[in-house]
């Protein structure tokens, strides 16, 4: 139910429901904690599905093989199943992180002061929207590019995990 709700509704709607809706029932949150809660719940839903799919991608025989060589259930999970699942899950989890970084601009809609909101304030004073929004886009692009490089490095490390050269 949780995953269905958070994957099936727009992030902006989730921000509004938590920030404005909870105040209607007496739960008052400042904008920043409300945004942190929503981003955490939203990303958690996507990450849960990614990890579930990655775990299901590991053949059942791997679990049986680990137990046949004398490993306990937990040893089999941590030494055999999870390393394989993480190789599968790492790229989509990294992509989710990159998307979340870009989605933080939505928090301006509940008055969280972040880069996009600051830019809107400057635009209101200078009447120079194009250049300023291009600069914000460039900053997001640079940050996303760095995260992509980190992702590729992590993928290479995970791909070589367990493969000893000899």
Report the location of each language-model feature.
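Transmembrane alpha-helices and adjacent helix-loop boundaries
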Residues: 1-166
């Amino acid at each position: 139910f949780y995953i269905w709700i958070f994957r099936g509704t727009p992030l902006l709607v989730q921000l509004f429901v938590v920030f404005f809706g909870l105040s209607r029932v007496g739960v008052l949150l400042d904008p920043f904690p409300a945004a942190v809660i929503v981003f955490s719940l939203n990303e958690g839903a996507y990450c849960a599905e990614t990890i579930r799919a990655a775990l299901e991608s590991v053949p059942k025989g791997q679990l049986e093989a680990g137990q046949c060589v004398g490993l306990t259930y937990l040893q089999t999970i941590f030494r055999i199943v999870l390393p394989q699942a993480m190789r599968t899950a790492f790229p989509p989890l990294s992509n989710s992180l990159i998307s979340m970084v870009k989605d933080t601009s939505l928090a301006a809609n509940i008055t969280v002061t972040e880069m996009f909101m600051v830019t809107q304030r400057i635009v209101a004073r200078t009447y120079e929207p194009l250049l300023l929004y291009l600069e914000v886009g460039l900053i997001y692009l640079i940050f996303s590019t760095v995260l992509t490089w980190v992702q590729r490095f992590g993928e290479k490390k995970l791909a070589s995990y367990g493969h000893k050269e000899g």
